[in-house]
Amino acid sequence: MGKLSTHVLDTAHGTPAAAMRVELYRIAASGTPELLKRVVTNLDGRTDAPLLSGDKMRTGIYELQFHVAEYFEGRGAELAHEPFLDLIPIRFGIADEDGNYHVPLLVSPWSYSTYRGS
């Protein structure tokens, strides 16, 4: 069986983004999101266990939500009253239940990048 994982790197400080809140949603055919999991990244900017694995790993549309403003405020960053990046949603599809899907996020208070990792 495959798995879904993530890894968050803080490019403003050059470190893993430890203690960032991340939520995983499955998007129903109607477009309604269903919360599957809430996690906080560990000291390495990763989750302690895969976000999905085993029989929970199903094809479909998913969304990861990264609470970046909350994270950077916790690091002492001076953000505007309305931060440029608050919550970053990344919506993606899982086409193969046996595939390994890794969604890295490289982020600063002003920019982000992601890709499908392995």
UniProtKB/Swiss-Prot annotation:
* Keyword field contains RNA-binding: no
- The superkingdom of the source organism is Bacteria
Any keyword Iron-sulfur?
no
Which EC class, in a word?
Answer: hydrolase
Instruction: For this UniProt record, give its keywords in alphabetical order, as a comma-separated list.
Output: Hydrolase, Purine metabolism
Which reaction(s) are listed as its catalytic activity?
5-hydroxyisourate + H2O = 5-hydroxy-2-oxo-4-ureido-2,5-dihydro-1H-imidazole-5-carboxylate + H(+)
Which of this chain's residues are annotated to bind substrate?
A: 7, 46, 115
Q: Which cysteines are joined by disulfide bonds?
A: none
**CDD domains with a match to the protein in the record:** TLP_HIUase (cd05822)
EC numbers, comma separated: 3.5.2.17
Q: Which GO terms describe its biological process?
A: purine nucleobase metabolic process
What GO MF annotations does this protein's record show? hydroxyisourate hydrolase activity
Give the protein family.
Belongs to the transthyretin family. 5-hydroxyisourate hydrolase subfamily.
State what this protein does: Catalyzes the hydrolysis of 5-hydroxyisourate (HIU) to 2-oxo-4-hydroxy-4-carboxy-5-ureidoimidazoline (OHCU).
Q: How does it assemble?
A: Homotetramer.
Which NCBIfam families does the protein's record reference?
hdxy_isourate
Q: What else is known?
A: HIU hydrolysis also occurs spontaneously, but more slowly.
Q: Which protein is depicted?
A: 5-hydroxyisourate hydrolase
